[in-house]
Amino acid sequence: MEDEEVAESWEEAADSGEIDRRLEKKLKITQKESRKSKSPPKVPIVIQDDSLPAGPPPQIRILKRPTSNGVVSSPNSTSRPTLPVKSLAQREAEYAEARKRILGSASPEEEREKPILDRPTRISQPEDSRQPNNVIRQPLGPDGSQGFKQRR
C-alpha cells in the first residue's frame, strides 16, 4: 500500500485506468481465495416429473396399544372391571343410607308428613280492604296536547 500512488481525485484515477487495475487485482485475489477454500460440491436437487409413474403409496399400519400388563386387548373387551350386579334391596338400602347422610332423613315419606315451614304464608286481604285503583291524572303530550287521549 505504501508504494501505491494516490490520485488527487477519483476523476483522475478513472481517466488513468487506475481504478480498473485495482478492481481487477482484487477480483483475482478473491478468486484465488475461493479456489483454496473450496466447499464440498453441492448436491443436485431432483424434481420429480408428473409424467413419470409414482411409486406405491406408503403403507400405513394402525397398531393397537398394549394394556398396563403388556398384553394387547381386543376392541370388544372393556378396560373397566365389571361390577357385580346389585339386587333391588341392596340398591334401595344404599340409597336410603346416602339420603339419610345427606338430607337427614331415610325416606321421602317422612318429609311429606311434615308441613313446610320455610315458606311464608301468603296473607290474602278481603276485597273490601283493598284500596281502589284510581287514576290520578292522564299524561299529556310534550307539546301540551291530550297525550294518550288524542284520537288519530
From Swiss-Prot:
Residues 111-152 form the SUZ-C domain. Keywords: Acetylation, Phosphoprotein. It comes from the Eukaryota. Residues 89-100, 109-130 have a biased composition (Basic and acidic residues). The modification Phosphoserine is found at residues 37, 39, 51, 105, 107. Residues 42-107 form the SUZ domain. Residues 29-152 are annotated as: Disordered. The modification N-acetylmethionine is found at residue 1. Residues 66-81 have a biased composition (Polar residues). The keyword Calcium does not apply. Disulfide bonds: none annotated. Belongs to the SZRD1 family. This is SUZ RNA-binding domain-containing.
